[in-house]
Structure formats: C-alpha cells, structure tokens
Amino acid sequence: MKIRIGIAGYGNLGRGVECAVHHAPDLELVALLTRRNPASIKTHTGVPVYRMSDAAKLRDQIDVMILCGGSANDLPEQTPELAQYFNVIDSFDTHAKIPEHFSRVDAACRKAHTIGIISVGWDPGMFSLNRVISQAILPNGKDYTFWGKGVSQGHSDAVRRIEGVKDARQYTIPVEAALERVRSGENPTLTTREKHTRECFVVAQEGADRAKIEEAIKTMPNYFADYDTTVHFISEEEMKREHSGIPHGGRVFRCGATAGNPTHRTGISFRTITSSNIA
C-alpha cells in the first residue's frame, strides 16, 4: 500500500516535492492545495488541485500533507491549521522561532492525534543531524555553520512580500575571513554579523518608494537586521538574465580537541553544494 501524499502550496518547493513524490515507488500524490484559483494551476503530473479552504474535505484521502509555503508568513499559520486534519511535514526555517513554531504545531497535533515533523530541509535538517553526530564524536568543541554563497529562497520570499516589491533574490554570502579563522583551528567566537553578509537584488513596482523598501529589508527581524545587507534595485530584464538560477549550499564545522588536550586539534566538516534548486 502506498503512502498517500498531499502538497500545500505550488511554488518552486511544491513543484520539487511533486517531482520527488512522482519518482518514489512507495508514495502516491493524490491532491494539491492552493490559495490561488485551482483552475490557474498547471501541474507536471496532472494531480487534482483544490482550494486551501477545502482541506478538511480531504482528510480521509491523504496520509501525509507536505507544506511548501514560506516560513515568514505561511507556515506559522498553515502547519498548525492543517495538522487538524493530516499528518504534516514542513520546512520552517526561521531558526529563532522554531521553538515557538514547535509548540503551536505540537499542540495542534496532540489535539487531533496527528503527527507533525517540522523544519525538514538542509538547514535546519541535514545540517542539524550532522551537528548532533559531530557533537557526539567531538564533545569538547564548537559548532560553526556557514551558508552560501547562494540564493536563500526563504529570504527572497520575505523580500517579495514587502509592499512595492515585484520580484527579489537574496544571496547569503559567507565572510571569507571568518571561514579561514574556523578552518585554521582558532575556534573563534563569531557574531552573526561577522559570519555572513546578505545581498538583495530587487525589482520595485512602478512608483514604489525605494528608500522605504530598502529600510524595510535592512530592519527586518530574524532575516536582515543582524547582518550587513546591501540592496540593489534592478530591472525585470536584469533579474531574468542574471538571477534566474537558485544555487545554494553551505558548510557545518565542529572544531575542538581530543583527549582533553587543547593541542590535539580535531575538526569535522560537512558540506552541501547545489547548482540550482529550481524544480
């Protein structure tokens, strides 16, 4: 018997999940939920499309609902809501708010007797697992995580939701000097700002207040406020020509010492490289 899958949201992530389910012999995609007009959605596999508001009607047809919305505004509401009807999986990645998100989803799942798995992805996700393994192997040490250089889909989505923004890409860029200090075994104490910079390329709507948009980006909590952020306003043509791909990746380091001797330096690292996350 195949596991019956539903997808909530049909952006780049939703299309990627659709392709992954299609290639998994033990999974069956039975429905797609969207906030848009279902008639406007053209899927790769021809799966039936329903309005998000019709979710409750599908509760006996779906075993697991995979949520593919954004962490800024979608998942905080959608995951606990859909957990009333289905076992759910999401990729919530606002690190500072994961405990709060867990509490809300956990409460909804306990009430409905469903199961929720949150923050699945590469970080949080694969990187989280590698931190646990590295900490078990090297308990006397420090963890370091560097993302990029690459396009953060979540941060790009957060920028696109700002009033006056037509399109946006956000690049997360590791600070090379910080990377080198970690690689050298220095075990530095680094602030958020010292580890990464952020660079935004924004297509503004005609007549939009660009100064207001830039201020909204640079002061956005949990996304940009703690980083040195550069904002570039560009044309739609330049966006399509120069920023149509979605490459990303990152590295996790565990640096420390063995046998209680600080001179016996040991390092563990894990890296992901993705040329493009476009489905």
Question: Residues of each region from the PLM?
Answer:
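Hydrophobic Val/Ile/Leu positions in short beta-strands of Rossmann-like dinucleotide-binding domains
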Residues: I5-I7, L67
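C-terminal substrate-binding/catalytic lobe of Rossmann-fold NAD(P)-dependent oxidoreductases
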Residues: R4, G16, H23-S53, V151-I278
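Oxidoreductase and adenylate-handling cofactor-binding alpha/beta cores
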Residues: M126-K142, D157-Y171
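General beta-strand structural signal in soluble alpha/beta enzymes
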Residues: D90-S91, G116-V120, F146, Q170
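Glycine-rich Rossmann-fold phosphate-binding loop(s) that bind the pyrophosphate
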Residues: Y10
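Rossmann-fold NAD(P)-binding glycine/threonine-rich loop
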Residues: F92-G116
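Rossmann-fold NAD(P) dinucleotide-binding segment
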Residues: A55-V64, A72-S91
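Hydrophobic/small residue at the entry helix of a nucleotide-binding pocket
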Residues: L13
